[in-house]
């Protein structure tokens, strides 16, 4: 059984980020139901590292449900540099949000994890049972461990108080409103920004690394639909991986080619192999998702890349970069 419909007041933390904006769009485009009141907040509304501010926000909104997206995030190179900062800031945010949600009587919290939480040394495909089987990749251990702790905390809230606090594990998310910063962003938005600059200046495109690592990319608007389904229908405390299938994994080289094609770039493409590749692959199984939603249709990768590139070009001045 899903949540009884109606009488849902849903607070979305991190509402101005990539996934928050996607949920906002999907809700506005008709996915919201009568009786659902959606409240999207960002760091402008409260500093979630501060317990008193977080509690005041939750007291004010009085949500029945929370989608917790707020986090200090960054790409591979920023993670390598600031493992402690990622750990400390996020541990405060997560504890403040989860405990304030508990204190105001929220019926359900859905938090957002990441596939980087999985053990570095593992078998593939990875699934939801493997989260705590070994240490994560050393490059971003601070962020990885702090995200794992949400799963630990969810289980503890359930054991001690019977709370339905759960989490989703998306693979590599991309789409409109992403962070397109070349130094600090994730791989795909970074590539989009680089291609835009190379095209504008007539220079070559340099892709960091060998281009060989493989990733499962999920379009933010697809993820938004799945988040809403989890909020209404998924009642396990165990996390669920939200991902395209294993066969839809693409190499960084293929991702770069999709961006080059979408942006009609005709310059030279080179790979800077002095830059780190990070994990070679982190192939995730979406079989648990498919047992619940066998017919869910993901946006084809090239179409999603095309839409994201078009959004970035149209919103270049305002885009995070």
Curated annotation (Swiss-Prot):
Pfam families: Epimerase. The active site is at 143 (proton donor/acceptor). Substrate binds at residues 194, 208, 215, 277. It comes from the Eukaryota. CDD domains: GDP_FS_SDR_e. One of its GO terms (biological process) is positive regulation of endothelial cell migration. NADP(+) binds at residues 14-20, 147, 170-173, 186. InterPro entries: Epimerase_deHydtase, GDP_fucose/colitose_synth, NAD(P)-bd_dom_sf. GO terms for molecular function: GDP-L-fucose synthase activity; isomerase activity. The record marks 114, 116 as: Important for catalytic activity. PANTHER family: GDP-L-FUCOSE SYNTHASE (PTHR43238:SF1). Homodimer. Belongs to the NAD(P)-dependent epimerase/dehydratase family. Fucose synthase subfamily. This is GDP-L-fucose synthase.
